[in-house]
Amino acid sequence: VTEEPRTVHGILVPSKSTLDRYGMTEMEWQDILEQQDWVCGVCCKVPPSGRLFIDHEHVRGWRKKSKEARRKYVRGLACYVCNRFVLNYRVYPQLLRAAAAYLEAYIARRMKEE
């Protein structure tokens, strides 16, 4: 018999195995969720799926570390789009700033044309 997925403020609670993978307890996960006001830590939206992913720093060999050590690499909770595309493990803050400058320059050019 499969259990119904549990939710907290409309957000799906990760499985115990998922929490264990990141060295977290459900209470720690809920603390992060509460600190983020029950939304994605990046776009500040409630995902339509109700699912927030555990975003973590991508460090070589982190899965072999103790639970306590793995927990230190958790950055927050993010929706699928932000976790997959904005926080991709190859993306760094300077790259995001460059992307923002690129888009802002495009918007400025468009505004001049109008």
Task: Briefly describe each language-model feature range.
Residues 7-10, 57-59, 110-111:
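Positively charged, low-complexity intrinsically disordered regions
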Residues 7-39:
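Short, charged surface segments at domain edges that flank catalytic/cofactor-binding sites
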Residues 30-55, 101, 108-114:
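Terminal non-globular linear segments
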Residues 39-81, 86:
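Histidine-centered nuclease catalytic patch
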Residues 86, 90-114:
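A detector for short metal-coordination/catalytic motifs
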